[in-house]
């Protein structure tokens, strides 16, 4: 019985499609044509302003630091993109490392101590020392003001 049941719907569908196509192509197509433009027109009346997706970058800060260090040197947009990607990568590494440190110590909060330890672990040698001193200076300036 299963093969018969499978054959019957297959036979009926083409017959129904043919009968629908033969009986009312002139009637149904204009109605559908009329409905679609009205719906599209109604959607067109409610024009919503497309907001430009804001992308946060470090480009302005990179440029400011560049001008502090070398005022006469510029940077290409491709190099700026690379620097922005580099900073995002470093911050992501620092965040994950400080998160691990907080978890190891069973603390719910990432403090400046976890960040400082993460900097020492992620950055190599002399760079870590300079980063820690600059970070300490920035935190002191922030808390004093």
From Swiss-Prot:
Gene3D superfamilies: Histone, subunit A. The modification N,N-dimethylalanine is found at residue 2. InterPro entries: Histone-fold, Histone_H2A/H2B/H3, Histone_H2B, HISTONE_H2B_site. GO terms for cellular component: cytosol; nucleosome; nucleus; plasmodesma. The modification N6-acetyllysine is found at residues 7, 12, 23, 28, 34-35. Residues 1-30 have a biased composition (Basic and acidic residues). The modification N6-methyllysine is found at residue 4. PROSITE patterns: HISTONE_H2B (PS00357). There is a cross-link at residue 141 (Glycyl lysine isopeptide (Lys-Gly) (interchain with G-Cter in ubiquitin)). It holds the Pfam family Histone. The modification N6,N6-dimethyllysine is found at residue 13. It comes from the Eukaryota. CDD domains: HFD_H2B. Can be acetylated to form H2BK6ac, H2BK11ac, H2BK22ac, H2BK27ac H2BK33ac and H2BK34ac. It is found in: Nucleus; Chromosome. The modification N,N,N-trimethylalanine is found at residue 2. One of its GO terms (molecular function) is DNA binding. SUPFAM superfamilies: Histone-fold. PANTHER family: HISTONE H2B (PTHR23428). Belongs to the histone H2B family. The nucleosome is a histone octamer containing two molecules each of H2A, H2B, H3 and H4 assembled in one H3-H4 heterotetramer and two H2A-H2B heterodimers. The octamer wraps approximately 147 bp of DNA. Core component of nucleosome. Nucleosomes wrap and compact DNA into chromatin, limiting DNA accessibility to the cellular machineries which require DNA as a template. Histones thereby play a central role in transcription regulation, DNA repair, DNA replication and chromosomal stability. DNA accessibility is regulated via a complex set of post-translational modifications of histones, also called histone code, and nucleosome remodeling. This is Histone H2B.7. It comes from Arabidopsis thaliana (Mouse-ear cress).
């Amino acid at each position: 019985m299963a093969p018969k049941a499978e054959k019957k719907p297959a036979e009926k569908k083409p017959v129904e499609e043919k009968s629908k196509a033969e009986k009312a192509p002139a009637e149904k197509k204009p109605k559908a044509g009329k409905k679609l433009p009205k719906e599209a027109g109604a959607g067109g009346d409610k024009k919503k302003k497309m907001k430009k997706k804001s992308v946060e970058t470090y480009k302005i800060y990179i440029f400011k630091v560049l001008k502090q260090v070398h005022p006469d040197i510029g940077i290409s947009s491709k190099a700026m993109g690379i620097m922005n990607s580099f900073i995002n990568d470093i911050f992501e590494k620092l965040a994950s490392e400080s998160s691990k440190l907080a978890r190891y110590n069973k603390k719910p909060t990432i403090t400046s101590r976890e960040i400082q330890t993460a900097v020492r672990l992620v950055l190599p040698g002399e760079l870590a020392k300079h980063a820690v001193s600059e970070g300490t200076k920035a935190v002191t300036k922030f808390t004093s003001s």
